Amino acid sequence: MCLALCLWSACDERTPDLYSAPDGIYFNNRTSGSVWVDTTTLTFVYEPDETMYLDVPVVIQTIGRQADIDRPVNLKVWSDNAEEGVDYELLTPAVVPAHASMFSYVVRLKRTEAIKTELKSIYLEL
């Protein structure tokens, strides 16, 4: 009798809930050891003299479902002491491609005369 009650009450068929989470976006930059970082420091000191720029990929990732369309990202880029076009260039559009949940936004840092003696900072904000 106990076995019959256990078998009778053990099954409850339900449809699982679908994944749902609020949509969001964040920087997902990691070191080679998979440690999350929010700041990157680069130097031209160890680069050959003929290296005139360094391309820095900034990984941007979404939270939530992928979309069937490209989605522009409201990315703010600014600097207190670096000038776009002179000290750096923004090479890729700030757009999450259709059917993707992440992309690399590339910032090109230029080797200028000023960078030899002065620290330049560029800030990115979502």
Q: Which residues are covered by each model-predicted region?
A:
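Sec-dependent signal peptide recognition
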Residues: 1-2
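C-terminal motif of bacterial Sec signal peptides marking the signal peptidase cleavage site
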Residues: 6-10
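Acidic/polar, low-complexity intrinsically disordered N-terminal segments immediately downstream
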Residues: 12-85
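Intrinsic-disorder/low-complexity, polar/charged segments enriched in Ser/Thr/Lys/Arg/Asp/Glu/Gln
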Residues: 53-57, 101-104, 121
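Short beta-strand and strand-turn-strand segments in soluble, beta-rich domains
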Residues: 78-94, 101
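Short, hydrophobic beta-strand segments
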Residues: 97-101, 105-113
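Short glycine/proline/serine/threonine-rich loop/turn segments at secondary-structure transition edges
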Residues: 113-121
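Enriched for extracellular/lumenal, surface-exposed ectodomains of secreted and cell-surface proteins
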Residues: 124-126
